[in-house]
Structures are given as structure tokens and as C-alpha cells.
Amino acid sequence: MKENEKDLIKAISNLVQLDIDAVHAYDQAVKEVDDPIIKERLLKFQEEHRNHISSLAEHIRNLGGQPPGKSKDFKGYVIEAFAAIRSFTGLKGALKAMRITEEITNRYYGEVVSWEAPAEVKEALRTYFSEEKIHLDYIISNLQAMP
């Protein structure tokens, strides 16, 4: 396996881990969201993160790597705890926690999407980065609309 393939596998594995961590953070956040429209949208975002995990794990295997397990890493525990604490303050706190989670995810997708990769991997990364931007934009828009 070439060095750049190893680096790509590691980068995609880090994205998978971020998506795993985001799924757990959404679990905490949606518990405190009473607004049915926002809750439904957050659950949709969580499902998109699950889809990213499955798809990117398959790409990792196709590249000859082994995807990470579906448990949180240390950063994931911190993100989940932060989401839980913020969510206790209700909808606004939950959205603030998810904004931070999505900012981290967007930042890393933004870096990795520019890497050299096989066409099908590149397309998946572009699609998922686009979805991540939608998640963040939605959360920011709702926060800005709140008093």
C-alpha cells in the first residue's frame, strides 16, 4: 500500500470517527428538543451521519484499510458530554452544542475533500461535505432566529 493511500485511509477513518461522535452527540441533543420540526430535522441529520459512517467504512475497506469501530473515542466522549450539558438548557443549548459538533465536522471534511482520492471516494466526500454544510447552516439559522 502506498504512503498516500495510508494517509487517505487514516483521514477517512478520522471522518468516520467524527461522524460516530456526531451520532452520539445528536442522541443527547434531541432528548431536549421539544420543537417537532427541529427535532425531525436533527434526527434526519443524525441519520445522514450514520449513512456517512457506513459508506465511508466501505470505502476504507475498498482501499485496503480497516474502518474504526462504532464506539466513541475520547474526543467523542467529550463532545457527547458537552452536548448533554448544553442540552439541559433546552433547545438553544442543544443547538449550540450541535453547532460546535458540526463546525468540527465541517472543518475536517473541508480539509479532506481536497485530497487526491479515487473518483468514487472523492464524490462521496463532496456529497457528505455538502450535507455537513447544510447541517451547520440549518443550526446557525435557527440559533440566529432565537432571542
Name every feature range the model reports, one short phrase each:
Residues 54, 58-96, 100-106:
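Carboxylate-rich helix-loop segments that flank metal/cofactor sites and access channels
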Residues 7-15, 34-54, 91-95, 120-131:
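Alpha-helical scaffold segments that form or flank carboxylate-/histidine-based iron centers
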Residues 101-147:
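Preference for long, well-ordered alpha-helical segments
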Residues 1-9, 63, 81-92, 142-147:
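Membrane-interacting alpha-helical segments
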Residues 37-73, 135-147:
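Conserved alpha-helical segments that form or flank metal/cofactor-binding pockets of metalloenzymes
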Residues 1-2, 24, 75-80:
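Short alpha-helical hairpin
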Residues 2-33, 92-116:
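Alpha-helical bundle segments that constitute or directly flank the non-heme di-iron/ferroxidase center
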Residues 24, 28-31, 54-61, 65, ...:
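Charged/polar positions within long, soluble alpha-helices
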